[in-house]
Protein backbone atom coordinates (compact mmCIF):
# COMPACT_ATOMS: atom_id res chain seq x y z
CA UNK A 1 0.00 0.00 0.00
CA UNK A 2 2.79 2.42 0.91
CA UNK A 3 4.66 1.49 -2.28
CA UNK A 4 1.57 2.24 -4.35
CA UNK A 5 1.28 5.62 -2.65
CA UNK A 6 4.92 6.50 -3.33
CA UNK A 7 4.67 5.43 -6.97
CA UNK A 8 1.47 7.43 -7.39
CA UNK A 9 3.03 10.54 -5.84
CA UNK A 10 6.15 10.35 -8.01
CA UNK A 11 4.05 9.78 -11.12
CA UNK A 12 1.84 12.75 -10.25
CA UNK A 13 4.82 15.08 -9.77
CA UNK A 14 6.43 13.99 -13.04
CA UNK A 15 3.15 14.45 -14.92
CA UNK A 16 2.57 17.89 -13.41
CA UNK A 17 6.08 18.98 -14.40
CA UNK A 18 5.44 17.82 -17.94
CA UNK A 19 2.15 19.72 -18.14
CA UNK A 20 3.89 22.99 -17.15
CA UNK A 21 1.35 25.88 -17.09
CA UNK A 22 -1.56 23.53 -17.85
CA UNK A 23 -0.91 21.44 -14.72
CA UNK A 24 -3.52 21.09 -11.99
CA UNK A 25 -0.78 21.84 -9.44
CA UNK A 26 1.85 23.93 -11.24
CA UNK A 27 5.26 22.89 -9.95
CA UNK A 28 6.63 26.37 -10.69
CA UNK A 29 4.60 27.72 -7.76
CA UNK A 30 6.89 25.90 -5.35
CA UNK A 31 9.73 28.18 -6.42
CA UNK A 32 7.87 30.97 -4.61
CA UNK A 33 8.90 31.08 -0.95
CA UNK A 34 5.62 32.45 0.39
CA UNK A 35 3.67 29.76 -1.44
CA UNK A 36 5.92 27.01 -0.04
CA UNK A 37 5.46 28.32 3.49
CA UNK A 38 1.71 28.54 2.96
CA UNK A 39 1.42 24.93 1.83
CA UNK A 40 3.51 23.68 4.76
CA UNK A 41 1.48 25.69 7.26
CA UNK A 42 -1.84 24.63 5.77
CA UNK A 43 -0.71 21.00 5.90
CA UNK A 44 0.42 21.15 9.54
CA UNK A 45 -2.61 23.14 10.70
CA UNK A 46 -4.83 20.70 8.80
CA UNK A 47 -3.27 17.81 10.71
CA UNK A 48 -3.96 19.47 14.05
CA UNK A 49 -7.43 20.76 13.19
CA UNK A 50 -8.95 17.62 11.70
CA UNK A 51 -7.16 15.38 14.19
CA UNK A 52 -8.67 17.29 17.10
CA UNK A 53 -12.11 17.57 15.49
CA UNK A 54 -12.13 13.80 15.03
CA UNK A 55 -11.05 12.81 18.54
CA UNK A 56 -12.58 15.51 20.76
CA UNK A 57 -16.18 14.30 20.16
CA UNK A 58 -15.00 10.83 21.22
CA UNK A 59 -13.94 12.29 24.55
CA UNK A 60 -17.34 13.93 24.99
CA UNK A 61 -19.14 10.69 24.18
CA UNK A 62 -16.96 8.38 26.27
CA UNK A 63 -16.04 10.50 29.27
CA UNK A 64 -19.21 12.60 29.45
CA UNK A 65 -21.71 10.04 28.21
CA UNK A 66 -23.06 12.28 25.45
CA UNK A 67 -24.85 11.04 22.37
CA UNK A 68 -23.18 11.81 19.03
CA UNK A 69 -25.65 14.65 18.44
CA UNK A 70 -25.05 16.21 21.87
CA UNK A 71 -21.29 15.83 21.44
CA UNK A 72 -21.53 17.72 18.16
CA UNK A 73 -23.62 20.48 19.73
CA UNK A 74 -21.17 20.70 22.62
CA UNK A 75 -18.44 21.79 20.19
CA UNK A 76 -20.37 24.96 19.25
CA UNK A 77 -17.90 27.17 21.21
CA UNK A 78 -15.33 26.25 18.56
CA UNK A 79 -17.55 27.48 15.75
CA UNK A 80 -18.59 30.63 17.63
CA UNK A 81 -14.97 31.61 18.29
CA UNK A 82 -14.01 30.72 14.72
CA UNK A 83 -16.64 32.94 13.11
CA UNK A 84 -15.99 35.86 15.48
CA UNK A 85 -12.21 35.86 15.06
CA UNK A 86 -12.46 35.33 11.29
CA UNK A 87 -14.52 38.52 10.96
CA UNK A 88 -12.28 40.54 13.28
CA UNK A 89 -9.01 39.42 11.69
CA UNK A 90 -10.39 40.01 8.20
CA UNK A 91 -11.20 43.62 9.10
CA UNK A 92 -7.82 44.18 10.75
CA UNK A 93 -5.93 42.81 7.75
CA UNK A 94 -7.94 45.02 5.39
CA UNK A 95 -7.16 48.06 7.52
CA UNK A 96 -3.44 47.49 8.18
CA UNK A 97 -2.30 45.18 5.39
CA UNK A 98 -0.41 43.13 8.00
CA UNK A 99 -1.07 39.44 8.42
CA UNK A 100 1.91 37.84 10.19
CA UNK A 101 0.88 38.90 13.69
CA UNK A 102 -2.54 37.28 13.20
CA UNK A 103 -0.97 34.17 11.70
CA UNK A 104 1.41 33.71 14.63
CA UNK A 105 -1.36 34.39 17.16
CA UNK A 106 -3.69 31.95 15.42
CA UNK A 107 -1.23 29.08 15.26
CA UNK A 108 -0.18 29.81 18.84
CA UNK A 109 -3.81 29.72 19.99
CA UNK A 110 -4.34 26.40 18.23
CA UNK A 111 -1.28 24.96 19.98
CA UNK A 112 -2.56 26.20 23.35
CA UNK A 113 -5.87 24.46 22.64
CA UNK A 114 -4.07 21.16 22.09
CA UNK A 115 -2.20 21.62 25.38
CA UNK A 116 -5.49 22.29 27.19
CA UNK A 117 -6.99 19.12 25.71
CA UNK A 118 -3.84 17.21 26.68
CA UNK A 119 -4.61 17.91 30.35
CA UNK A 120 -8.18 16.58 30.21
CA UNK A 121 -9.29 13.94 32.68
CA UNK A 122 -12.40 11.82 32.63
CA UNK A 123 -13.92 14.11 35.29
CA UNK A 124 -12.86 17.45 33.78
CA UNK A 125 -15.75 19.97 33.85
CA UNK A 126 -17.32 20.98 30.55
CA UNK A 127 -16.35 24.62 31.06
CA UNK A 128 -12.70 23.56 31.02
CA UNK A 129 -13.23 21.66 27.76
CA UNK A 130 -14.98 24.75 26.36
CA UNK A 131 -11.88 26.85 27.09
CA UNK A 132 -9.87 24.58 24.82
CA UNK A 133 -12.61 24.78 22.18
CA UNK A 134 -12.54 28.58 22.23
CA UNK A 135 -8.75 28.61 21.80
CA UNK A 136 -9.07 26.15 18.93
CA UNK A 137 -11.83 28.09 17.17
CA UNK A 138 -10.03 31.40 17.62
CA UNK A 139 -6.79 29.89 16.36
CA UNK A 140 -8.40 28.48 13.26
CA UNK A 141 -10.25 31.73 12.59
CA UNK A 142 -7.01 33.70 12.70
CA UNK A 143 -4.74 31.16 11.01
CA UNK A 144 -6.71 29.82 8.06
CA UNK A 145 -7.30 33.06 6.17
CA UNK A 146 -3.85 34.45 6.96
CA UNK A 147 -2.12 31.30 5.69
CA UNK A 148 -4.06 31.59 2.44
CA UNK A 149 -3.12 35.27 2.24
CA UNK A 150 0.54 34.36 2.78
CA UNK A 151 0.45 31.76 0.01
CA UNK A 152 -1.16 34.25 -2.39
CA UNK A 153 1.03 37.21 -1.49
CA UNK A 154 3.82 36.59 -4.04
CA UNK A 155 1.91 34.62 -6.68
CA UNK A 156 1.27 36.28 -10.07
CA UNK A 157 -2.36 37.15 -10.73
CA UNK A 158 -2.72 34.61 -13.54
CA UNK A 159 -1.79 31.80 -11.12
CA UNK A 160 -3.90 32.98 -8.18
CA UNK A 161 -6.67 30.43 -8.71
CA UNK A 162 -4.24 27.52 -8.96
CA UNK A 163 -2.36 28.72 -5.88
CA UNK A 164 -5.52 29.03 -3.78
CA UNK A 165 -6.77 25.60 -4.83
CA UNK A 166 -3.35 24.10 -4.16
CA UNK A 167 -3.03 25.33 -0.58
CA UNK A 168 -6.57 24.14 0.16
CA UNK A 169 -5.57 20.78 -1.31
CA UNK A 170 -2.65 20.57 1.13
CA UNK A 171 -4.92 21.50 4.04
CA UNK A 172 -7.30 18.70 3.08
CA UNK A 173 -4.42 16.26 2.81
CA UNK A 174 -3.18 17.38 6.21
CA UNK A 175 -6.64 16.71 7.58
CA UNK A 176 -6.65 13.21 6.12
CA UNK A 177 -3.25 12.49 7.64
CA UNK A 178 -4.25 14.03 10.97
CA UNK A 179 -7.49 12.10 11.34
CA UNK A 180 -5.85 8.81 10.38
CA UNK A 181 -2.77 9.35 12.55
CA UNK A 182 -4.64 10.58 15.62
CA UNK A 183 -7.13 7.71 15.55
CA UNK A 184 -4.31 5.21 14.99
CA UNK A 185 -2.46 6.57 18.02
CA UNK A 186 -5.63 6.52 20.10
CA UNK A 187 -6.61 2.94 19.43
CA UNK A 188 -3.06 1.60 19.48
CA UNK A 189 -2.61 2.98 23.01
CA UNK A 190 -6.10 2.65 24.47
CA UNK A 191 -6.05 -1.13 24.76
CA UNK A 192 -2.86 -1.29 26.81
CA UNK A 193 -3.79 1.73 28.93
CA UNK A 194 -7.18 0.22 29.77
CA UNK A 195 -5.67 -3.19 30.50
CA UNK A 196 -3.23 -1.63 32.96
CA UNK A 197 -5.97 0.20 34.82
CA UNK A 198 -8.33 -2.78 34.86
CA UNK A 199 -5.51 -4.93 36.27
CA UNK A 200 -4.95 -2.42 39.07
CA UNK A 201 -8.68 -2.07 39.77
CA UNK A 202 -9.12 -5.86 39.84
CA UNK A 203 -6.97 -6.01 42.96
CA UNK A 204 -9.78 -4.24 44.81
CA UNK A 205 -12.44 -6.55 46.21
CA UNK A 206 -15.28 -4.07 45.66
CA UNK A 207 -14.38 -3.76 41.96
CA UNK A 208 -14.37 -7.54 41.56
CA UNK A 209 -17.73 -7.74 43.29
CA UNK A 210 -19.27 -5.08 41.06
CA UNK A 211 -17.77 -6.58 37.91
CA UNK A 212 -19.22 -9.96 38.86
CA UNK A 213 -22.79 -8.70 39.14
CA UNK A 214 -24.99 -10.11 36.32
CA UNK A 215 -25.63 -6.82 34.50
CA UNK A 216 -21.96 -5.80 34.54
CA UNK A 217 -20.73 -9.29 33.69
CA UNK A 218 -23.07 -9.37 30.69
CA UNK A 219 -21.84 -5.96 29.48
CA UNK A 220 -18.21 -7.06 29.83
CA UNK A 221 -18.76 -10.29 27.93
CA UNK A 222 -16.45 -10.30 24.92
CA UNK A 223 -14.64 -7.17 26.12
CA UNK A 224 -12.11 -8.63 28.54
CA UNK A 225 -9.95 -11.27 26.86
CA UNK A 226 -8.49 -14.26 28.75
CA UNK A 227 -4.97 -12.94 28.14
CA UNK A 228 -5.78 -9.71 29.95
CA UNK A 229 -6.29 -7.69 26.79
CA UNK A 230 -9.32 -5.63 25.86
CA UNK A 231 -11.50 -5.67 22.74
CA UNK A 232 -12.37 -2.11 21.74
CA UNK A 233 -14.37 -2.67 18.59
CA UNK A 234 -17.41 -1.03 20.20
CA UNK A 235 -17.39 1.28 23.22
CA UNK A 236 -21.17 1.08 23.67
CA UNK A 237 -20.69 -1.41 26.53
CA UNK A 238 -19.59 1.48 28.77
CA UNK A 239 -23.16 2.81 28.90
CA UNK A 240 -24.32 -0.44 30.50
CA UNK A 241 -21.65 -0.62 33.20
CA UNK A 242 -21.84 0.50 36.80
CA UNK A 243 -19.78 3.72 37.13
CA UNK A 244 -17.38 1.97 39.49
CA UNK A 245 -16.67 -0.69 36.87
CA UNK A 246 -16.51 1.76 33.97
CA UNK A 247 -13.99 4.01 35.71
CA UNK A 248 -10.77 2.18 34.72
CA UNK A 249 -12.00 1.94 31.12
CA UNK A 250 -12.66 5.68 31.01
CA UNK A 251 -9.29 6.46 32.58
CA UNK A 252 -7.54 4.31 29.97
CA UNK A 253 -9.38 5.94 27.07
CA UNK A 254 -8.68 9.45 28.32
CA UNK A 255 -5.04 8.62 29.01
CA UNK A 256 -4.63 7.58 25.37
CA UNK A 257 -6.47 10.71 24.22
CA UNK A 258 -4.01 12.87 26.14
CA UNK A 259 -1.16 11.40 24.10
CA UNK A 260 -3.12 12.18 20.93
CA UNK A 261 -3.54 15.82 21.91
CA UNK A 262 0.11 16.10 22.93
CA UNK A 263 0.96 14.91 19.43
CA UNK A 264 -1.31 17.63 18.06
CA UNK A 265 0.44 20.19 20.25
CA UNK A 266 3.82 19.08 18.88
CA UNK A 267 2.60 19.53 15.30
CA UNK A 268 1.12 22.90 16.26
CA UNK A 269 4.44 23.95 17.78
CA UNK A 270 6.20 23.15 14.50
CA UNK A 271 3.70 25.36 12.67
CA UNK A 272 4.20 28.11 15.28
CA UNK A 273 7.98 28.07 14.83
CA UNK A 274 7.59 28.29 11.04
CA UNK A 275 5.08 31.14 11.32
CA UNK A 276 7.12 33.12 13.85
CA UNK A 277 10.60 32.73 12.40
CA UNK A 278 10.21 31.95 8.69
CA UNK A 279 7.28 34.05 7.53
CA UNK A 280 8.33 37.60 6.53
CA UNK A 281 6.57 40.53 8.20
CA UNK A 282 5.45 42.12 4.95
CA UNK A 283 2.62 44.55 4.31
CA UNK A 284 0.10 43.84 1.60
CA UNK A 285 -0.45 46.50 -1.03
CA UNK A 286 -3.84 48.04 -1.61
CA UNK A 287 -3.91 46.36 -5.03
Give the residues covered by each predicted segment:
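Small-residue-rich alpha-helical segments with characteristic i,i+4
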Residues: 52, 75, 129-215, 276
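Hydrophobic alpha-helical transmembrane segments
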Residues: 15-24, 78-85, 196-218
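Transmembrane-helix exit segments and adjacent C-terminal regions of multi-pass membrane proteins
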Residues: 14, 214-287
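Loop-to-transmembrane-helix entry motif
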Residues: 33, 37, 99, 170-176, ...
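Extracellular/lumenal inter-transmembrane loop segments of multi-pass membrane transporters
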Residues: 62, 94-95, 117-128, 158, ...
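Membrane-embedded alpha-helical segments of multi-pass transporters/permeases
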Residues: 10-14, 115-119, 184, 188, ...
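Transmembrane core module of solute transporters
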Residues: 1-2, 7-162, 265, 286-287
Amino acid sequence: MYAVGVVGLVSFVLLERRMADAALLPVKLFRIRAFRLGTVLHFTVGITMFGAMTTLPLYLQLAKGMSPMKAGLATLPTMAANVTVTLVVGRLMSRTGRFKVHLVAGVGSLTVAMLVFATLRDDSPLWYVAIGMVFMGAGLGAAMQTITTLAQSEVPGRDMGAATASVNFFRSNGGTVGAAAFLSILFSLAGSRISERVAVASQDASFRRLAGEPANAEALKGVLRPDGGVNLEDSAFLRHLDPGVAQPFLEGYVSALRVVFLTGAAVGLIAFVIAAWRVPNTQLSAD
